[in-house]
């Protein structure tokens, strides 16, 4: 019999992502000055200490109250979505856990520091991608997983009709 909710997996996933996110940001803040950069893989990956008081690409810089309110709403919506829409679907529950962990990780930074610590600096196919962190990666992977699940469900539902 399939379990309705995989709470322990979801909580563990959220906890692991949050720990890696917060510890990595702490290590960056204690060991590097803003702007310091270390090349890890030439022409591909650097660790660069950066701060962002906005969202992706620095949009809405300095709008902390907005981010506090929106993040709290998003976290509540994710919990509701998990309960109402993710029953019996481990993949969707993992996706929501990744989204929750990513949103919470950056929220913690905003509350404690007034900005988000970013440090993963990549050059992908010649494009100097904006600097990001583990929470951002978790959000991105979570969104991809949600999209995959929705497409898969749409295909299955179409076959059943």
From Swiss-Prot:
Transmembrane regions listed in the UniProt entry: 9-29, 63-83, 88-108, 131-151
Membrane topology: Multi-pass membrane protein
Pfam families linked: Peptidase_A8 (PF01252)
One GO location term (cellular component): plasma membrane
Classification via InterPro entries: Peptidase_A8
GO BP, one annotated term: proteolysis
Pathway assigned to this chain's UniProt record: Protein modification; lipoprotein biosynthesis (signal peptide cleavage)
Keywords assigned by UniProt, alphabetized: Aspartyl protease, Cell membrane, Hydrolase, Membrane, Protease, Transmembrane, Transmembrane helix
Location(s) in or outside the cell: Cell membrane
Enzyme class: hydrolase
The reaction(s) this protein catalyses: Release of signal peptides from bacterial membrane prolipoproteins. Hydrolyzes -Xaa-Yaa-Zaa-|-(S,diacylglyceryl)Cys-, in which Xaa is hydrophobic (preferably Leu), and Yaa (Ala or Ser) and Zaa (Gly or Ala) have small, neutral side chains
Record has Protease as a keyword: yes
EC number in record: 3.4.23.36
Sample GO molecular function, one term: aspartic-type endopeptidase activity
Major localization listed first in the record, in broad terms: membrane
Active site: residue positions: 118, 136
Superkingdom of the organism of origin: Bacteria
Family statement drawn from the similarity comment of this UniProt entry: Belongs to the peptidase A8 family.
UniProt function note: This protein specifically catalyzes the removal of signal peptides from prolipoproteins.
NCBIfam families: lspA
Name of this protein: Lipoprotein signal peptidase
């Amino acid at each position: 019999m399939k379990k309705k909710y995989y709470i322990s997996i979801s909580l563990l996933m959220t906890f692991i992502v949050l720990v890696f996110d917060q510890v990595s940001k702490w290590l960056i803040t204690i060991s590097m000055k803003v702007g310091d950069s270390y090349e890890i893989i030439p022409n591909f990956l650097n660790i660069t200490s950066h701060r962002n008081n906005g969202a992706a690409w620095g949009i809405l810089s300095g709008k902390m109250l907005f981010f506090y309110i929106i993040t709290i709403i998003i976290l509540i919506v994710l919990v509701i979505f998990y309960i109402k829409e993710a029953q019996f679907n481990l993949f969707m529950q993992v996706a929501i856990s990744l989204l929750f962990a990513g949103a919470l990780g950056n929220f913690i930074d905003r509350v404690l520091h007034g900005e988000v610590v970013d440090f993963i600096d990549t050059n992908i196919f010649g494009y100097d991608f904006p600097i990001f962190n583990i929470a951002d990666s978790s959000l991105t992977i979570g969104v991809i997983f949600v999209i995959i699940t929705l497409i898969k469900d749409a295909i299955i539902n179409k076959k059943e009709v």
